[in-house]
Structure formats: C-alpha cells, structure tokens
Amino acid sequence: MNHTSNELFKAVRYALYAGTTAVVGLSAAPVLAQDDTSSQKLETITVTGSNIRRVDIETSNPVVTIDRAAIEKTGKLTLGDLVQQLPAVTGPNTNPQVNNSGGTGFSSIGLRGLGSSRTLVLINGHRYLSGDPNAIPANMIERIEVLTDGASSVYGSDAIAGVVNFILRSDYQGAEFSADYGISDRDDGASKGYSFTFGQSSDKGSIMAGVNYKKIDGVLAGHREFSKNSVSRLGSTSSPIGTFVGGSSSSPYGHIKIPAGMADLFPGCSSGFLARNPSASGLNVATDYHCYRNNATAEGPSDKYNYATVNLVMTPQERTGLFLNGNYKITDNVEAYLNVLHNKTSAAFQLAPAVFGTPYGAFISKDSYYNPFGVDFAGNTFTARLESLGNRSASSGTSNDQLSTGFKGSFSVWNDQQWNWELGFDYGHVHQSTTTYGLPNMSVLNPGMGPSFYDQTSGQVFCGTGPDDIIDGCTPFNPFNLQDPNTIAALQAAASPGVSNLFSKETVKRLDLNGGLFELPAGTMQLAVGYNYRTEYIHSNVDTGLIVDFNGNCTLGSQCGSALQGGYNVKEAYAELFVPILKDLPFVHALNLTVGDRWSKYNTFGSTNNTKFALEWRPIEDLLLRGTVSKVFRAPTIGDIFGGAASDAPKISRDPCDGYTGGGNPACVNVPTDGSFVNENVRQALQLSAIASGAAFAGFPIGPEKGKSFDFGIVYDPHWLEGLSVSADVWRVYLNENITGIGAQQVIDLCSAGQTAFCPLIRRYPSGPSQGQIQTLIEPTGNLGRVDVGGVDFALNYRLPEFSFGRFNVGLNATYLKNYDLQTAPGLEGNTTYHFAGHFENYGSAQAAACPGAGGGVCLFPRWRAQSSVGWQMGPFDASWAMRYIHRFRMGSASPSQDSHPYGTGNPSLDGLYTDYGSTVYHDIQFGYNLESLNTRFDIGVNNVGDKQPPFLYANNTLNANTDPSDFDLMGRYYWGRVTVKF
C-alpha cells in the first residue's frame, strides 16, 4: 500500500524525493537515506490519518499522495476522474459519464468498493459537506492525500474504507493564469477551462485567491458504436451467449395485453401483447393491431423501442468557482486563518421519451371512444412511449459553499514541551435546484381517458357518456394512437416542467490540542485531544406534480419523490497517544505504538466508541513493518433516517409465487392458487413500480453500522539503491448491520422465507386481469447485511540516477482484491452470500441490488487494478506515460447458487450462464515544455492513446451505455492542451 510524500519544507529526505513525485505523481513515499542533518531542525507535520504532529512522514498510516505536479500534468476532465482511477477505488461510483442517476456534475469516491458513503472527504483535514471533488478548484490544491485504512477513531463516522483529504495551497507569491482545451478524436465532448490565481505573502501572513471556469460538452450515446443500441442477451446452455438489438417493450405504438376472449383474433401470439400497426387509426382491433414482436421475425421487425440512442455517455456541465485562503499572525504564537470556497455547477442528463401507461397511474376506461377493446385497462396491461413530448431531461444548478475559519497557535509547557492548539469553525452549504422536462401530467390526461363519445352533429369527441352528460374542461385523449395530431396536441398541453429544490447545511465547532508529554528513552511521548460539535440539516421542496403516491406514481409521470426535512447533532471527543517504545537497539531501530479513541454521541441513536491500535517497527533503518487495527462505524445519514418516499423502477429476477398452488406463503397474498400465475415483470424483464424510502417512512428501526479494519504492511527504502521504495500492505474490512436500501428482490425473498416484517411492504393486485402481479413495493432503508472485503496493495517508486539524456522516474501502484463477500441477511432465513470479487453484476440481478453503493445498478469488482507511469525530464522538457489496468472479470454467477441472468427463473435457458471478459489497459501520454524567458509552460497530451473501447456488457436494456461508466472510459481517444503563464 502507498505511503505519503508530504511536504517537509527543507528536510533532506523530501528534497531527494521531490523529483520522483513531480513526474510519477502517485507516491508511496520512501524514507530515503539522509545527509547529516543534525544541525537542521525538521518541522513537524500532521499526516492524514493521525492528529499527532511528527517529523516522520512514514508512519503506520498507508497514504497515497497525488501531488500538484501530477494534477497539472493530467488531461482528466475533472478531479473526480483523477481520484477515481486510483487502484483502491472500485465499485459503483458516480461521475459525468453516468447519465441515468447522474447528470448533476457530481463525482463520488468509494474506496475498497464499499461505496462513497463509507469514504470520508476532507478539505485541509476538515469535513467537506458536499463531498464533490469536482467542485474544488484545481488551482487551489497543493496535493491530495488518500488514506486507505479505517479512521473512525480520528475522523468519526464514514471513514470506514478510508479518507480523501484535499490539502490547499498556502503562502503563494505571485500570479498565475492557465487555459486548457480538449476534444475527442470524434470531434465531440469538447472541454475548455480557465483559471487565475493570485497570492501575496509576508512575515505577518499570506493571502491567496483565485477563480476558475470549466465547461464540458455532452456526448450522445448514439455517437459511440458500443452505446448506440439497447442490447439484450440470448443463448442456451449448449451454445455461447450472444446478443441482439433489443429495447424497451414500451414502444410509441403500444404494448397492450390481449384481453381475455380476444386471443383467437391473434392465434399463436406467444408474447401475449399487441402493438398498433403504424399507419392504422387503432379503432379496429382485428385490422389495426398485430402480435407484439419481442424480436424480428418473418412477419416484421421487432416492436421494441431503441431508447439508447438519445442517452448520454458524457453529461454536459459548466462550473464557475472562486476561493480565498489566508492567514495572519496576530502574535508570534497566535494566527488567524480563513478558507472560503464557492462553486456553481450547471449540469444536465437526458433519457428517452417518457413511458406512459397503467403501471404509472394511467387508467383507460372501457367506455372511452378510442378504446376498441371494450375492457378497462389497469395494472400491467398497457404501456406506450410518448415521443411527441421529446426526451426526458433534467437540468440542475448546484451552489456549493464551504468556509473554515479560526485561530491556531502554540505554547510551551513543562520540560519545554511544545503544544499546538486550534479553535475553529466550519460551515458548509449546498443548494441544488432541478428542473425536469418531458413528463406528462396524469391529472390532466386521466380524465380524458374516461368515458367519451363521438358527437355526430359536431363531428367531435367529447368526454362523457352522451350529449346530455358532457364533462366540461375535459379533453378526450387517445392513448392507442399517440401519433394522431389531436393526441399530440393534448399531450403537449398536459406537459409541464417540475421544479425541486434541495438545501443542506453543516456546522462544526472544534477545539484541537496536541503536543509532547515528556521524554522517553526512545523519544517524546505525544498526545492529541479534541472536541467538536457538529450539526447537519437537510430540507427539500418537491414540485407538487412530482410528489409520489402510494403506487409509486405522481401527476408528472413516474419520476416521483417527496419532501425531505430532518437533521441531527453529534458531540465528539477524541484522544490519541503516541508512545516511542524502543530505539537504536539491535533489530529495533525504532518501535512505536499509537493508541486512539473517539467517542461520538448522536441525538438520533445514541453513542459509540471507536478505538485504534497502530504499531510501527523498524528492525533496521531501511525497513518498516506496520500494522493497524481499528474499530469503524457509519452513522445513518439524514436521508437514511428521514428520507421520504421516492419512486423506483427495480427489476426482479424471480418471484416465489410463480406457479403458486396455495400453502400459505406470506409473500403470495392475492396470488391465484390454480398454479397458473407467472410474474410478468420477471418473464418480460419489466421494471416494477416501487417506492424507496428512509427508515422512518417504512417504520423500520435504524442504527449505525459497525465493523473493524485491519492493515499490516511493509515498506522498504534501501539505502544501497537511492531513490527506490517498495511497499506491500495486507488489508481487510469487516462490517456488520450494514445501512442499506433493502431492494425489491430482498423484500420478496425475506418475506417468502418467513421474515414477516417485510410482507406488508409488498402490495399485489387483488383482482382483475393483473391479479397477483405486484402493484407496488416499498424498499426501506435499514440495518441488514454483512460485508467482508480484503486484499493486498502494492507500490513501487524509483527515481533513477540522472543521465546525460535526462532523469527518469518510474512508479507502480496496484491493488489485488482477494475477497468481497456480502451476506444479505445474516442469521435470517433467506440469507444469501454473494462473492463479488472478480465479477460484474448487472442491473436487475439480485446481486447488483445488494451491491454497496449501486442502488440496484451495476457493480464491478475486478481482482486487479493498477496504475503505472514513467516520467522523463531534461532541462525545460518533460514527458510522461501512464498506464491504467483493469483485470479480466466474469459477468454473472457470483456464487454457484445464483443465476447470472436478471430474467432469473422466468428464462431458465439462461440460468447459470456467464460471460468472461478480458482485461482492459489504457495508455495516456503527456509532453511539457517550460519557456522560462516568458514564465510560460506548455502541456499537450492524449488520453486513451489506443482508443480502447469499453467492454460490451449485456445488461438487458437497462445499463448506462451497455457498459460500466464507473470504471471504463466512454469518450475514446482524447486530445488536450494547456498553457500556464506566471507573473
């Protein structure tokens, strides 16, 4: 595992290593052989993962550092892209490539595949409310330190998998302007950015300010070969899995269940559904409709709708930011400081036109003039695609403000021990406004699908049962012919944008002290103590047309939610003790122990204590053996507790009630007992209408998740080969009582297994043509599940001796994932263990629904992830090559008992099948030139030089771009350039 290369100012070891980090960028910082520095006093610093100030940069904490030079020499579009490519970051993470469930400009960081909620994001060691790295100006950052170990004893909640700490620049003198531009080799996805930084420093203090601007153009999925079609899998146990161009069953010409008694009109119709003939009016069942074709046949093409083309593989965003960072010495021992950050981001996502139909709140009366079938349509009997409304889209504006201010200083106590103190206040505020377009107002359309008649006198259709019963203010609506001009006009009149707002606020008041207690033979025993009081509050306003009803629907379609309001406060105190035990003995060059504890008391669930024990042993000066054992926890968030109802559209792979003949299965209430029942959502891979909610809404208790983190490593910095550092760390994280959204498949399985608390969450149609089908289902948030994840980190950095043709630096960082095991409901009937390591789990599978952070989406956990780089510098010229490696993986079969296919038992010919994918390697190159006479630097580069395309992942019409946008590059070869001028 990597270790930090922090700034030690004039320290010799840092000076020797600076050349390596400037080109390689990612460092597991070695402790290099030193010259005689006895006359120098090395300044102490605080390393991410500890509150103790020390001279040593190599401690028990495994930290990887991305320095400023690496940030400046990358052509990555966002800071989030840069951090997400670290080998320790895996699993589902949001970024601008994520369209469905993304599109806000936000990037998340999830270390160890445990999800972003278990990785804490800091700025200068303090909590960062929004957690969005993209909102931090790149010209504001000195370095990024990533701790890959549990740190709840130091930072409190969320620091389970580790910490990402953005360290800001300070004491800057001068001015700097930078401009950059990039574009793909397909002439799309253009990006441009500008930044200006100014700073002044003196003996009394410093001030630094800057502004920045970045714009990234969106890219349509139809502009990439791998994403232009929605794709499904097919195959059998005796033949390889292949693909066909599929799509959504909800087409512009309808997906209409054949009513009982009309099957004879369509003999041999295996799908059981109809679609209108494109040129027909839809008023005559026998002549205007045909059997819905799930695939192309001799009778005609597939009726499925290719929704993929208009989706995005890069969501557009535009951001403007400014920052101020200053400090002032009030006295020799007291300093005031202020850090202010403001960012405004505009972003958007785009999806195919809205799906309309009876599962989403529509009801079509048998007495409608336009209904030729003579039966009511409700339940899962009718859907269609509203192309005339245009694409569904949402634009968001996010304002992110962060302030940190206070006083800090130092004083001496007994035996001339130096102590440092800090009294501070942190404030964070986020406001996000989202406007949604392309959704129909069902409160306007539904009356028009009630009884209606054709008036012979006027030649018009009116709402009502006859001339004497005309309903005023009602416009008849024809759902069976969405291309009719009158229908289009009615739809467009019924469409209206929905506006929602979210406000969140965090305040922290803190006091920190650290310093020496007394001298021991091996060094100074040190203590760090502190106290803080933190409050968090969230409030949201949801457009009335988007407020969800009990069926998961709303008047503006199916993308529905509800208001959220809630907050909590927490009081915390910590102590950390550093004990130098032995020093300068045979086989004990140094032996140090660190013990820490943090007490946290929440007004929502109570208190928790989390401890840490860390040991550092240097048998010789060049070799460090280190180990850490920590208790970790995550408190339930405001959303976990108070989150209201929000519509969801999950898929399920099985229904235990298929073929039900009685027997009292509690999951099968209202299901017919004649053995004929087949769940249509499973059989046709249709999405359910569901409601996801916080614990309070569903009546579920919730508390913190708890666990342990282990890290044992070795770092070798041989004095006989100056510039070389190698390290390896074995790590493991156990978590119990996971805070999770309990997905639809889990709710059904647990109820069927006798866990009756989940049964009231399932609501099936009690009668009619959809009897027994799931009408709606509540997916609550609660404590359920256990995670065991472990692996090994490796790092190598080597600064070669300088040659006549320049200086070279090489680096390698890699993570091996040994195991990733998740139990869905330990100790309960219905528990399933998923083995995620080396697997990709696709949307709609029970495995993906349980994947941390995926929200029912996709999750990939390759066994190996790695980065390597080679840097060269000679005079004013420099160049670098970087490689990123993602190991081969298998889609499906995360355990022998699981099907690999989201259709589950509804498509038994595909059960147990899997697909193997090869490894993926990306190459980036960069060239730089310093024109010193003009104080100007030029950088050009190419990302993904080989134009490596992402693996084609077949996830049955529901996956973003037919691949995994969290892990793979969707843009292809990308050219970029940057000019930086210093004044």
How would you label these PLM feature ranges?
Residues 217-219, 223-232, 271-274, 278-318, ...:
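Surface-exposed, low-complexity loop segments enriched in small/polar and acidic residues
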Residues 119, 126-150:
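Short acidic/polar hinge/loop motifs at secondary-structure boundaries
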Residues 648, 810-930, 947:
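C-terminal beta-barrel architecture of Gram-negative outer-membrane proteins
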Residues 171-174, 187, 204, 331-334, ...:
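Short loop/turn motifs that connect adjacent beta-strands in outer-membrane beta-barrel proteins
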Residues 83-124:
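Extracytoplasmic beta-strand/coil segments of soluble accessory domains associated
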Residues 79-82, 107-110, 158-179, 194:
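N-terminal periplasmic accessory domains that precede
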Residues 736, 818-819, 882-900, 928-983:
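C-terminal beta-signal and adjacent terminal beta-strands/loops
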Residues 1-86, 195, 199, 332, ...:
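N-terminal Sec signal peptide and the immediately downstream disordered periplasmic leader
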